[in-house]
From Swiss-Prot:
Keyword annotations from UniProtKB, A to Z: Cytoplasm, Elongation factor, GTP-binding, Nucleotide-binding, Protein biosynthesis
PANTHER family recorded: RIBOSOME-RELEASING FACTOR 2, MITOCHONDRIAL (PTHR43261:SF1), TRANSLATION ELONGATION FACTOR G-RELATED (PTHR43261)
Family assignment from sequence similarity: Belongs to the TRAFAC class translation factor GTPase superfamily. Classic translation factor GTPase family. EF-G/EF-2 subfamily.
Domain tr-type G span(s) in chain numbering: 8-290
Location(s) in or outside the cell: Cytoplasm
InterPro entries, alphabetized: EFG_II, EFG_III, EFG_III/V, EFG_IV, EFG_V, EFG_V-like, EFTu-like_2, G_TR_CS
Gene Ontology process terms (BP): ribosome disassembly
Protein name per its UniProtKB record: Elongation factor G
Residues given in the record as GTP binding sites: 17-24, 88-92, 142-145
GO MF entries: GTP binding; GTPase activity; guanosine tetraphosphate binding; translation elongation factor activity
Cross-referenced HAMAP family: EF_G_EF_2_B (MF_00054_B)
Gene designation per UniProt: fusA
A Pfam match: EFG_C
Assigned GO CC terms: cytoplasm
Length: 699
């Protein structure tokens, strides 16, 4: 089969936003105008095509990023047909993992902002993640029909809060209930979408007289931004020459792809205005797979040589699995992005992370929640494979003869844990299987069994995250569970350097055991992790035993020494020791390493660390005193305040331990008018009173 759409006409994009910016509605409209979805689903009624998990329909927030394929030729059919793959990303902070994961596989993104709420704290989080992955972006200021809508103010916030350079390509004609259409600043025309056919067709007129001055000024800014793309355009601009529409678009595209500017559009998805022009912008300014740097990976050799895979059909096949979903009809769906090469159904590919082969039995392309079986996928495509055996999020799928591991995604460690037990004994096994499936779908969710109590402990990124997991147990797997009180994920570390001997000797007839080491144990900077250094000279500890010493020390730290929590940021140096020709073994040195670690750790001024969360509360001014007082009572430190569109924004650092049940307390303190977001910030030393209590409990 030949390629239907040239790869230059692909756009793999994500739509990212704060919870209520109207992202799902915008995505719905995109699907409507691109002719796949003939009935526009409204989030308010809980029926949007993209929101296909039933919980999302109840909560009205988007949890799983579904991937959808759509086609677009422009409002005037002015382009050849382009293929747009849309990855829907959740806006809720407990799901930033989903956002990271989708940003990893997209080439460009649309950031949706509410014209009233502007840049909310959550938008900043997502924006930072997009910057980390160098994703070119456009902005869509939505909800222009709402009371208090102000396009200029939101553009200014993008500049000041997100430290970006927005370039408005449109101006709104009217606002709030007078919002009628937009001025297209590139072509200097006014566009009014027809309400009879839900905005499929539109009228084009001259710019309204009352907006002429403002439009001329805005266009000057836009043309200058385009001219800065290259010397040829700049020279023409400085010599007073008019840039053509083509030249302006060429300049804007180059600067958007270089992450220098953010083209800004406006509209009201709900009122069917502006999304059509936004789609033209996707084609005009966002990258195709060919416009972004070739993906890098490690080859299957001893050195892990770094190689690239270019986005071409003639390259060896390489793809990244970015989401696992359990589908009630077909079982496990593995969503993957193809970076290079071609693969057909029935082909066998290799997963280098697991070291296993996988056969691609069926490949489907998803449209939100309906699916189409396809025979092959090519570079640039996003599709889902049915029933792969052992592939987790972040794994690579590649050609068996050209093995490569694309960079792993990094997932944060969970910060909150709860014990769960099934309400009926008979559900124990069912619950175990269900939790295993959910953990495979979501790497930021972990399951383990507590060795002492035998309880099943689940851990995640926040209370909402775990609520949804428990909810899914009930809904998808029919397991009713009781949930214990939330537990905080503490860590341990040390404050000073010590030297410690560890000696494990057993001599009792026959072969004995002999392992003897000297370790230098020292603290590392926060987030530096565990480091093992071998400084043995002259073979006093033979080479083959050194990994065992490392393993013994590391496992002792992993299991916790002070109070049973994993110890972090510790450097271990093996600098001396001795061995016995007959009695020494790997096991003996592992025990010696572990003994030295446990003893040395307790002498190295050990401390307990607690997770500190970044909390951002948006509250009406009259409740500000109460909210701040409450944060102080929770051992919080307020770091700053500013005026937001819907009240004061208070930024604080608060220990996670003090934040349980905060949502309910905040609601009652402010009569439901305040909202907050919270995400993990860093580990800090826990105060002695709290540490002592926890250590006492552990012993």
């Amino acid at each position: 089969m030949a390629r239907k759409t040239p790869i230059e006409r692909y756009r793999n994009i994500g739509i990212m936003a704060h919870i209520d910016a109207g992202k799902t509605t915008a995505t719905e409209r995109i699907l409507f105008y691109t002719g796949i979805s003939h009935k526009i689903g409204e989030t308010h009624e809980g029926a949007a095509v993209m929101d296909w998990m039933s919980q999302e329909q109840e909560r009205g927030i988007t949890i799983t990023s579904a991937a959808t394929t759509a086609f677009w030729q422009g409002m005037d059919q002015q382009y050849p047909q382009h293929r747009i793959n849309i990855i829907d990303t959740p806006g809720h902070v407990d799901f930033t993992i989903e956002v990271e994961r989708s940003l990893r596989v997209l080439d460009g993104a649309i950031a949706v902002f509410c014209a009233v709420g502007g840049v909310e704290p959550q938008s900043e989080t997502v924006w930072r993640q997009a910057t980390k992955y160098e994703v070119p972006r456009m902005a869509f200021v939505n909800k222009m029909d709402r009371a208090g809508a102000n396009f200029g103010r939101v553009v200014e916030q993008i500049r000041t809060r997100l430290k970006a350079t927005p370039v408005p390509l449109q101006l709104p004609i009217g606002a709030e209930d007078e919002f009628k259409g937009v001025v297209d600043l590139v072509r200097m025309k006014a566009i009014y979408w027809n309400e009879e056919d839900m905005g499929v067709t539109y009228e084009q007129t001259d710019v309204p007289a009352e907006l002429a001055d403002e439009a001329a000024e805005a266009r000057e800014f836009l043309v200058e931004a385009a001219a800065e793309a290259d010397e040829e355009l700049m020279d023409k601009y400085l010599e007073g020459g008019e840039l053509t529409v083509e030249e302006i678009n060429r300049g804007l595209r180059a600067r958007t792809l270089a992450n220098e500017i953010v083209p800004a559009f406006c509209g009201s998805a709900f009122k069917n205005k502006g999304v059509q022009a936004l789609l033209d912008g996707v084609i005009e300014y966002l990258p195709s797979p060919v416009d972004v740097p070739a993906i890098e990976g490690e080859l299957d050799d001893a050195d892990g040589t770094v190689a690239t895979r270019k986005p071409g059909d003639d390259q060896p096949f390489a793809a990244l699995a970015f989401k696992i979903a359990t589908d009630p009809y077909v079982g496990t769906l593995t969503f993957f992005r193809v970076y290079s090469g071609v693969v057909q159904t029935g082909d066998t590919v290799f997963n280098p992370v697991k070291g296993k082969k996988e056969r691609l039995g069926r490949i489907v392309q998803m449209h939100a929640n309906s699916r189409e079986e396809i025979k092959e996928v090519r570079a640039g495509d996003i599709a889902a494979a049915v029933g792969l055996k052992d592939v987790t999020t972040g794994d690579t799928l590649c050609d068996i003869n050209n093995k490569i591991t694309l960079e792993r995604m990094e997932f944060p460690d969970p910060v909150i844990s709860v014990a769960v037990e099934p309400k009926t004994k008979g559900d124990q096994e069912k619950m175990g299987m269900a939790l295993g499936k959910l953990a495979q779908e979501d790497p930021s969710f972990q399951v383990r069994t507590d060795e002492e109590s035998g309880q099943t402990i689940i851990s995640g990124m926040g209370e909402l995250h775990l609520d949804i997991i428990v909810d899914r147990l009930k809904r998808e797997f029919k397991v009713e569970a009781n949930v214990g009180a939330p537990q905080v994920a503490y860590r341990e570390t040390i404050r000073k350097t010590v030297e410690q001997e560890g000696k494990f000797v057993r001599q009792s007839g026959g072969r004995g055991q002999y392992g003897h080491v000297h370790l230098r144990i020292s603290p590392q900077e926060r987030n530096a992790g565990y480091e093992f250094v071998n400084s043995i000279v002259g073979g006093v500890v033979p080479k083959e035993y050194i990994p065992s010493v490392d393993k013994g020390a590391y496992e002792a730290l992993e299991n916790g020494i002070l109070a049973g929590f994993p110890a972090i940021d510790v450097k271990v140096e093996l600098y001396d020791g001795s061995y016995h020709d007959v009695d020494s073994s790997e096991a003996a040195f592992k025990i010696a390493g572990s003994m030295a670690m446990k003893e040395g750790f307790m002498k190295a001024d050990p401390v307990l660390l607690e997770p500190i969360m970044r909390v951002e509360v948006v509250t009406p001014e009259e409740y500000m005193g109460d909210v701040m007082g409450d944060l102080n009572r929770r051992r919080g430190t307020v770091q700053g305040m500013e005026d937001g569109p819907s009240g004061k924004i208070i930024r604080a650092q608060v220990p996670l331990k003090e934040m349980f049940g905060y949502a309910t307390d905040l609601r009652s303190a402010t009569q439901g008018r305040a909202s907050y977001v919270m995400f993990f910030d860093e580990y800090q030393e826990a105060p002695a009173s709290i540490a002592d209590e926890i250590i006492k409990k552990a012993s």
